[in-house]
């Protein structure tokens, strides 16, 4: 029906007759000339109808309206110099219309595809929202990422194998979506939260190197980077170390950024879990933000077992964790702004919040200090503080106090760190800061004090140390690893347990009875008895990767037909 796409025409096509198909993007009637911007998935091109040259075509064109779907034949012409539009990729040319056919008319649109619209309307009329160029760009980028993934994985010798969607319910952290069986009354399939067991079984089967781009389903509370159904790039490889699989995935992500954005990513930083929590208060830190935290409890405890009085009130110096955040160029903050940040920190659980502004000369000598903490400023205190905290001229120091040993003070301050970074324009928006996080604890305690897996229950402890795992599970460190880019966790993986005894011990620690071990995981447990190889894997969030690559605000903008934060599909009115 067409010989070219609108957005692909250029000056080299001048004089050629072309047939185009698309939608009326804009319509302008100037009397003897009618101008239409014709749009297809590749872009827009200006078409003009001349009443003198093509009378019948011109008369019919007067009835065109926005979003009519048409087929048009015409001649590619170069625009007069005065009419060149450098804001369009086709702005140097236009089409002189000879004939057109209306393929379908359009009612007035319920939303304006030339501007932003409220989220509810965008999701209800998603098929119209996808006509917006930015949305097409996002979906096209997603397609490119998937194609690049397939090419990369095949070149690396991984086999693309799909695993079942109708599976068995297993305790993996989130709630399952259940599908009742018609043939087996009162029995249910579960939609997989991940293909975890299946890909491990593939390794035991000798497949050796596996991948797939797969749908996963989790019935959990949603946010901007979560959907009830999401897509992940799933990888599992036998006879590989954690270091080698990290190198492979780092190479893959660098290729994505190079191919899609023409950006050379720097070598990924690597931090332990304990380090990112202590320095940034988060296990998915945005390293573009230069603000770091430091535990200075010992400095305050050196003041003695007493309360000190300042403008902010009384603060206990003993048995209290004190975390300082050094905010570059924060001297300019007003007292009113500081008070707002103080309130923000206290809403996160911080019991007391103090500040200190510092000015220095070129010799790094302090010349001015301000803040409610000023009555503490003896020479010894300042020397101890400057020995632990890197302070520059015009910085402001924020001190957060917390005496609840069950709560992490740095985690409480993490949201404030992020807010300050954006409020003060400290985050370099055009930069990329990828990192690996390693050495996660094997377990954490849930709200009832029970041990649960930090990652999942198939993650191996470091060095496969069964004795350490049994003796003191709370101190066990896992062979898990996460990828974080600009504060967004885009991947998570681990070396897997390949020993029957070690997997059994893991289940025992988690309080899963031997009976339930067989009931829930009997297939995997039995398979581990038959020469299971060492293996490791990772899952990358495709939606999150594309969100970053397109600089979108949430993953709904990179999924063709997403759900709301309430897990509703407004377009098809599901669930019903």
From Swiss-Prot:
Annotated residues for binding of ATP: 218-220, 227, 489, 541-544
E.C. numbers: 6.1.1.12
Nucleotide-binding among keywords: yes
Stretches the record annotates as Aspartate: 196-199
Entry GO MF terms: aspartate-tRNA ligase activity; ATP binding; nucleic acid binding
Keyword vocabulary terms for this entry: Aminoacyl-tRNA synthetase, ATP-binding, Cytoplasm, Ligase, Nucleotide-binding, Protein biosynthesis
Any one of the GO BP annotations: aspartyl-tRNA aminoacylation
A GO CC term assigned to this protein in UniProt: cytoplasm
Reactions it catalyzes: tRNA(Asp) + L-aspartate + ATP = L-aspartyl-tRNA(Asp) + AMP + diphosphate
Binding site for L-aspartate: 172, 218, 455, 496
Database matches in InterPro entries: Aa-tRNA-synt_II, aa-tRNA-synth_II, aa-tRNA-synth_II/BPL/LPL, Asp-tRNA-ligase_1, Asp-tRNA-ligase_1_N, Asp/Asn-tRNA-synth_IIb, AspRS_core, GAD-like_sf
Localization (cell): Cytoplasm
Family stated for the protein in its record: Belongs to the class-II aminoacyl-tRNA synthetase family. Type 1 subfamily.
Functional note: Catalyzes the attachment of L-aspartate to tRNA(Asp) in a two-step reaction: L-aspartate is first activated by ATP to form Asp-AMP and then transferred to the acceptor end of tRNA(Asp).
Subunit structure: Homodimer.
Official protein name in the record: Aspartate--tRNA ligase
Classification lineage: Bacteria, Pseudomonadati, Pseudomonadota, Gammaproteobacteria, Enterobacterales
